[in-house]
């Protein structure tokens, strides 16, 4: 079920402060965040966030198409190594 419209998008408070500070500075550096649950807002467009996936921070450059999505969607937490090979097929 989607979030109620009257509540508005969820964003952690510290994330807004970090984004404002990054907008004010001239240096473009990766903003490290742990909040995968926060919604991407229009004021984040053009910034690069390091979204934590449980092991490391994955750099995510925010574009117009990402607005309204969550940060966690762009930082996968699981790695797929493929299914086990069929032993019968290898013998031939």
Curated annotation (Swiss-Prot):
<comment type="function">
    <text>Protein S19 forms a complex with S13 that binds strongly to the 16S ribosomal RNA.</text>
</comment>
<protein>
    <recommendedName>
        <fullName>Small ribosomal subunit protein uS19</fullName>
    </recommendedName>
</protein>
<keyword id="KW-0694">RNA-binding</keyword>
<keyword id="KW-0687">Ribonucleoprotein</keyword>
<dbReference type="GO" id="GO:0005737">
    <property type="term" value="C:cytoplasm"/>
</dbReference>
<keyword id="KW-0699">rRNA-binding</keyword>
<dbReference type="Pfam" id="PF00203">
    <property type="entry name" value="Ribosomal_S19"/>
</dbReference>
<dbReference type="GO" id="GO:0003735">
    <property type="term" value="F:structural constituent of ribosome"/>
</dbReference>
<comment type="similarity">
    <text>Belongs to the universal ribosomal protein uS19 family.</text>
</comment>
<dbReference type="InterPro" id="IPR020934">
    <property type="entry name" value="Ribosomal_uS19_CS"/>
</dbReference>
<dbReference type="InterPro" id="IPR002222">
    <property type="entry name" value="Ribosomal_uS19"/>
</dbReference>
<dbReference type="GO" id="GO:0000028">
    <property type="term" value="P:ribosomal small subunit assembly"/>
</dbReference>
<dbReference type="GO" id="GO:0019843">
    <property type="term" value="F:rRNA binding"/>
</dbReference>
<dbReference type="GO" id="GO:0006412">
    <property type="term" value="P:translation"/>
</dbReference>
<dbReference type="InterPro" id="IPR005732">
    <property type="entry name" value="Ribosomal_uS19_bac-type"/>
</dbReference>
<dbReference type="InterPro" id="IPR023575">
    <property type="entry name" value="Ribosomal_uS19_SF"/>
</dbReference>
<keyword id="KW-0689">Ribosomal protein</keyword>
<dbReference type="GO" id="GO:0015935">
    <property type="term" value="C:small ribosomal subunit"/>
</dbReference>
